[in-house]
Amino acid sequence: MSVGMGVDLEAFRKSQRADGFASILAIGTANPPNVVDQSTYPDYYFRNTNNEDNTDLKDKFKRICERSAIKKRHMYLTEEILKKNPELCAFLEVPSLDTRQAMLAVEVPRLGKEAAEKAIEEWGQPKSRITHLIFCTTTTPDLPGADFEVAKLLGLHPSVKRVGVFQHGCFAGGTVLRLAKDLAENNRGARVLVVCSENTAVTFRGPSETHLDGLVGLALFGDGAAALIVGADPIPQVEKPCFEIVWTAQTVVPNSDGAISGKLREVGLTFQLKGAVPDLISTNIEKCLVEAFSQFNISDWNQLFWIAHPGGRAILDQVEASLNLDPTKLRATRHVMSEYGNMSSACVHFILDETRKASRQNGCSTSGGGFQMGVLFGFGPGLTVETVVLKSIPFP
């Protein structure tokens, strides 16, 4: 097909496409400096929400925290902030959305910027080479969005093409990889900055006897941001890829309506989590694996390196048991959960970072612990599952 002056549109179309798979070229992470110890968090939480007299509920919360397999978490909300903003410590009695959003509008982009600067530094290329920005958060719905704010904070060129991924929840760490792959492979020379930034100020509130799933969330979630540089056809000896993004998919688990959900209200984001979630994920995950890896003639799930969203200890335990996984497969996932809790969309990128670093420290032959192929799973509201097939990079 040709148009005016002999321009070949088909050749032009092909010239816009990259030759190879999208690669993750750099990873950066960031957390607030405030650290809460899980062993003392029940005392801290019930003291700051003025519920110390509710000893029965506090004991339940202690048991939830003890079973969480989490050692510590990072949180923006400090004791000082909570004292200045007591409406955050009520359950559902006092409107607090304005207070929350005033904090989140500043802190979510700020922490995202911190992670992005680390990724850009590792990448080693000028910011002017960034062509696209994907910004993901489940916390702030302002217009213009946090994507706009972080682009300003970083000083990105006004022509950078921005995509906002908002209100997706925990599965979105996979979503942004799917989007970044499509952008990088369909725009030759594109370099995509991916940023996920999450903050529990949107969900923090006082306890309730009638909403124990809310207590589960309060025991699991932490604050964090992760950033990636994604691009196809890395420049030899200049860019140093750590993983290739080979294939992606998204699906909704059958009969899972309402299993994980959140509602943004005047009191912030309320959280609902049904006890059936670990069963729903563990009984459906093999279907996702078969769909993803049958095309590569892989059926032994222990021959993969694993990056699984740490939705909670029960989910990881049941996935491990249902697939007969070697305990080492989820070691990086469990480590990140232990050190940071569930940071929603940012979690899987922390696990990617941990996997490549541990692989090098342990003398493995590839960034995937010595394995060539790997899987990344995101689980979240819907119940939605994101599946990403990754290829590791051999270490020199």
From Swiss-Prot:
EC number in record: 2.3.1.146
Active site: 170
GO molecular function: pinosylvin synthase activity
Binding site for substrate: 60-63, 273, 311-313
SUPFAM superfamilies for this protein: Thiolase-like (SSF53901)
An annotated GO BP: polyketide biosynthetic process
Reactions this protein catalyses: (E)-cinnamoyl-CoA + 3 malonyl-CoA + 3 H(+) = (E)-pinosylvin + 4 CO2 + 4 CoA; 3-phenylpropanoyl-CoA + 3 malonyl-CoA + 3 H(+) = dihydropinosylvin + 4 CO2 + 4 CoA
Keywords assigned: Acyltransferase, Cytoplasm, Stress response, Transferase
Description of what induces expression: By stress.
Record's GO cellular component terms: cytoplasm
The keyword Lyase appears for this protein: no
Enzyme class per UniProt: transferase
Keyword Acyltransferase applies: yes
UniProt-annotated location(s): Cytoplasm
Source organism, top-level taxon: Eukaryota
The family this protein is said to belong to: Belongs to the thiolase-like superfamily. Chalcone/stilbene synthases family.
Function: Catalyzes the production of pinosylvin from cinnamoyl-CoA and malonyl-CoA, and dihydropinosylvin from dihydrocinnamoyl-CoA.
Subunit structure: Homodimer.
The name this protein goes by in its record: Pinosylvin synthase 2
This protein's encoding gene: STS2
